[in-house]
From Swiss-Prot:
Homodimer. It is an enzyme of class 6 (ligase). It is found in: Cytoplasm. GO terms for cellular component: cytosol. Pathway: Cofactor biosynthesis; (R)-pantothenate biosynthesis; (R)-pantothenate from (R)-pantoate and beta-alanine: step 1/1. This is Pantothenate synthetase. It holds the Pfam family Pantoate_ligase. Keywords: ATP-binding, Cytoplasm, Ligase, Nucleotide-binding, Pantothenate biosynthesis. One of its GO terms (biological process) is pantothenate biosynthetic process. Its EC number is 6.3.2.1. Gene3D superfamilies: HUPs, Pantoate-beta-alanine ligase, C-terminal domain.
Length: 281
């Protein structure tokens, strides 16, 4: 596996692959890899001739008071894991490389970013779309893989890719969970044992909602009420949002119909965790 840290070298490598007719699968990450990331890499490995993974803790998507400085970083560990998943190139640029002095350009997707995480994290998605657009232009992948756990992010990136005519196929991959149901996240390492146990309330609330839907419940207000009651029964949990939206446009719905997204953001202690479930009725 090759480690690349400069944009020029990364772009030159990608151009060489294109000249030789090889397809590139791309998995953008912020590092501190876990099984969810490795699942994306394996999907890319199965489908593409070459696999590139980026590791970049993007300062643009962190707001004031968020965990940019303490976000877990371990490039040696991540390199070992990426290589074990069959990755060809690990692209790990510095912030100075990505955003040199005088940088003033941003990508902003409207409407889809107004609710859910966009409401409580202003500027977050502008940071996400800016860095992903830059990475697409640098790596020049044929296919890019994203986890469904960040469902709003996935919808926003698909919208950006379509609107800007970027020649990349965006593939969403189902959430990877721990054996007890907790959605895998790099931020799970922050949790104390007690908080780790409390965090299971997210997947438990979604499972309760699924039971109700399978029993015929279609009223969104009723579903939100049950989810909220389930979460608030956990003393360490504080709800940021419980939302049920159309899965494509991320707009609120009153009745379940078609493909909908049930999305949660909950603080467990000091840590903000997200989870979601897509339902089709």
């Amino acid at each position: 596996m090759r480690l690349i840290e400069s944009i020029r070298e990364m772009t030159a490598w990608s151009r060489e692959q294109a000249r030789e007719g090889r397809t590139i699968g791309f998995v953008p990450t912020m590092g501190y890899l876990h099984e969810g990331h490795l699942t994306l890499m394996r999907r890319a490995r199965e489908a593409c001739d070459r696999v590139v993974v980026s590791i970049f803790v993007n300062p643009l998507q962190f707001g004031a008071g968020e965990d940019f400085a303490e976000y877990p970083r371990d490039l040696i560990r991540d390199s070992r894991l990426a290589e074990s998943a069959g990755v060809d190139v690990l692209f790990a640029p510095s912030a100075r490389e990505m955003y040199p002095k005088g940088y003033h350009t941003f990508v902003d997707v409207e409407r889809l970013t107004e609710g859910l995480c966009g409401a409580s994290r202003p500027g977050h998605f502008r940071g996400v779309t800016t860095v992903v657009c830059k990475l697409f232009n640098i790596v020049r992948p044929d296919v890019a893989y994203f986890g469904q756990k960040d469902a709003q992010q996935l919808a926003v990136i698909r919208r950006m890719t379509e609107d800007l005519n970027l020649p990349v196929s965006v593939v969403g991959v189902p959430i990877v969970r721990e054996a007890d149901g907790l959605a895998m996240s790099s931020r799970n390492v922050y949790l104390s044992p007690q908080e780790r146990q409390a965090a299971l309330v997210l997947s438990r609330a979604l499972a309760r909602a699924r039971e109700l839907i399978e029993g015929g419940e279609r009223d969104v207000a009723r579903l939100r009420q049950i989810i909220t009651e389930t979460i608030t029964a956990e003393p360490l949990a504080a709800i940021d949002y419980v939302s049920i939206v159309d899965n494509r446009f991320i707009q609120p719905v009153e009745t379940l119909a078609g493909e909908c997204l049930i999305a949660l953001a909950v603080r467990i202690g000091k840590r903000r965790l997200i989870d979601n479930m897509v339902v089709e009725v």
